[in-house]
């Protein structure tokens, strides 16, 4: 402290003003030091936990006695026995279960009544649109399904199937046609999926097949002689595989079961002789030459020796439903006229006519 004590007082010493000022200064300094000590929260006396039993006290804020009494006397925070009895009487375990069961039953009834599949997606009876030529504006919005049957001939890809409509508005409308998938008996071609679009102002696009593409692999039987200086249709007549029963073995032609782009591959193994030769292997579309698959032309110095010549190639051919393709060979040769040229009697490794549908729409030609 700043106070300086005087310890040599005599009984008759006078008290002067300096002594009084010194005492007042001491009292003032003592008050300041006491205030500092009181506000010091850092344990100024170095008291230990053991000294005050702090190990038995939770380190949380404790309510004062006054706060406890205020809480105890606050009737709005606590229910009385009478109130508790009234509340418990309003709800029981049985009553609560009955209410829950009723809420569940009501929810199920609402869903079953308003969200059945046939209410959302199925169009039946007079509401079902059976004519493929009907404009897109006539269809309802949303996702709808319709059955197409009775050998429908109005423009759907097949006479039997299911139509799915995905319509957002008259400018965002896509329609799918699904074949029934019944491949028994004569319904060999009833599997497949087609798609078309509606645009208000331009109408329906043509149907485009997107699944269930046709394919065929056809061979020959026996030896077939080729005409000289002429075209000969190759007699492919042995079916190895025909997914849609689309190959006509009597006329040696593949008939397109639906519009699309087709990949044609053909090969023949010929009996030949060394001399002047000129061969053209061609694919014919609807009876007319469409593309040349292979061309061989030459002359041999040694004449009339036996030899074999393979002709083969591939080409894409766009076709509409009902169009047909055939394989023809132009043949010209010199030398001994009695030595005929022919397609040899070979298996499908050498002689084959392959057809694979690639895409389900025949776009216009320019």
UniProtKB/Swiss-Prot annotation:
SUPFAM superfamilies: TNF-like. To B.subtilis XkdV. This is Uncharacterized protein YqcC. It comes from Bacillus subtilis (strain 168). The gene is yqcC.
